[in-house]
Amino acid sequence: MYAEIEKRTDKHSVYELCSIYGVSRSGYYKWLKRAGQPNRYEKTYKILDNYVLDIHSHHPMMGYRQIRDKLCLEFGWIVSDPTVWKSMKRLGIHGFTRRRKAAVSGSNLEHIRYSNLLNRKFKAEQPMQKIVTDVTYIKHHGKWYYLAGYMDLFNNEIVEWELSDKFDNFLVMKPAERLLKRKMSTEHQILLHSDQGVQYSSAGYCNLLKEYNVVQSMSRAGNPLDNAVMESFWGRFKDTLHKHFHYWESNDLSATIEQAAYYFNYERPVRKLKGKPPVLFRTELVA
C-alpha cells in the first residue's frame, strides 16, 4: 500500500494519497524511513535460515522435522514444522527421502517358532525391557556383507551390532552375547523379538537367551510389520550410509557402519524422544 502511494507522489500530494488509501501520513513516513531495510519478521527469518542452513550443511540427510527438533534442542528455537519447511524451501534445500520397499513374504521352511509375545507393542517403559533384532545385507566392493542389529525399543538406540561376510549363527549370537553380558545387572526380564530366521531359531541362539533368562518372541510368518520398527530402521540406516557416509568410497565398511551407528545414537533427533537423540534421552532419564 505504501509502495503504491510512493509511486503516485509525483502527481498527487501525500496528504491526498493517504486520505484515499485510508492510512496516516506518519505511518507512510515511517515506512519511507525504513524502506529498503528488513522488518523484524524478515530479520527473524534470515536468522532462522542461517541456523537451518548450518544444520543442513552438517546433516544433509535430515528432513524438516528433524531439523526443527535440533533447532529446539541445540539452539532453543521454538518453531513449527511448517516454518522450518518454508525456510528450507526458501533456501532451496531438502532432506533425503526414502523409497518404500515392498513387503516380502517369509520362508516356508520348517523351523522352531516362538509366539509373537511383543504383539506390535513397540513402546517400552524402561531401558532393556524390549529389544528387537534383525539382519540386513549390504553390497560393498562387489561383495555381500550381512549386518545384524539389536535395538532397545525404549529409546530406539542400537545397543549392539555385528558385521560379517558369513550369514551364519554367529552373526546374531556374538552381538547378543556381548549385549547380555553387559546387561547382567538388569533386574527385570528382557523380551527379545526377531523374525523367524533360522539363525534366530537355532539351538545355540535359543540356549544363549535361556542362559540369560531372556524371553524370546518371534514375528508371525510373512508379517514384517510384527517387527516394523527394526525393518523401518534398516531402510533409514542404509539410506544414510549411502547418501551421507558414502560407504562405497570406504575401504573399511565396519568403521563406516560404526560412524553411522554413532550418528543415529548420539546425533539424530527422534520425535518420540522429545526431539532428543536416543543416548541423550536415556542418560537424562537415569541421571
What are these regions (language model features)?
Residues 120-159, 165:
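An active-site-proximal beta-strand-loop segment
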Residues 97-103, 192-196, 210-229, 245-250:
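RNase H-like polynucleotidyl transferase catalytic core
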Residues 18, 25-126, 223, 277-285:
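Basic, flexible linker segments flanking DNA-binding modules
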Residues 18, 28, 52, 67, ...:
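Mobile genetic element proteins and their domesticated derivatives, centered on retroelements
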Residues 1-12, 49, 53-58:
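Short, amphipathic alpha-helical "recognition" segments used to contact nucleic acids or chromatin
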Residues 12-13, 62, 79, 248:
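Residue-level signal for the short linker/turn that defines the boundary of a DNA-recognition helix
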Residues 162-185:
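Active-site beta-loop-alpha junctions of metal-dependent nucleic acid enzymes
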Residues 203-206, 210-214, 235-287:
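C-terminal domain-tail junction helix/linker
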